[in-house]
Amino acid sequence: ALGENINVMSKKGMMLVDMGAGTTEITVITMGGIVVSKLLKMGGNTINAAICQFVKERHHLVIGDKTAEALKIELGHAIPGRGKQKRVFGRDLITGLPANVEVADHLVFDALKDYLFQVVKTIRNIMETIPPELSADIIESGIYFTGGTTLIPELDRLFSASLHVKTVFADKPL
């Protein structure tokens, strides 16, 4: 928050969402204090593991974490339907030999959506439990997002549409 010139000492309530590699932290602050904070033990690494699992189940191909990360970066999108593909290499589960397949962006979206749904659900739950004055402040100022996982394209559109709140993404999320 401090790196993005957000005044954490403000009397206005703010929601900060840090979408990191290993965890996602959703925090509401006001006057320099934490009102509520929820830590999800999931993040970008969770998405990578899901991509590995989806490729394994749908293509019978074992891929590594670096390949999953490349798929997430190149095909990952919070809104489905771009129609892009990427060829990946791995080990065929049936023959045990090296093999390659074309992975479609909708597979990567399928791997992303459970994580994104959980983040939206947690933000909604927090918004429902905080005092109305803080909710009003957050609706006015928006929800602030940071962390490497926020680099997934169209997250702003997804969160704005799902939460009906303005979203503000860090210029330098890492």
Model region roles, listed by residue range:
Residues 1, 41-42, 169-174:
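Active-site nucleophile and cofactor-binding loops and adjacent substrate-binding regions
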Residues 1-17:
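Conserved phosphate-binding catalytic cores of ATP/NTP-utilizing and phosphoryl-transfer enzymes
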Residues 6, 125-133:
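Conserved helix-loop functional segments at active or binding sites
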Residues 9-13, 23-24, 140:
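Short coil/turn connectors at secondary-structure junctions
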Residues 16-23, 29-33, 43-45, 123, ...:
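A short acidic Gly-Thr/Ser loop motif
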Residues 30-117, 128, 138:
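Phosphate-binding glycine-rich/basic clefts of nucleotide- and phosphate-handling proteins
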Residues 80, 135-159:
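Glycine-rich phosphate-binding loops at beta-strand->alpha-helix junctions
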Residues 157-174:
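Conserved phosphate-binding/catalytic loops in two-lobed NTP-binding clefts
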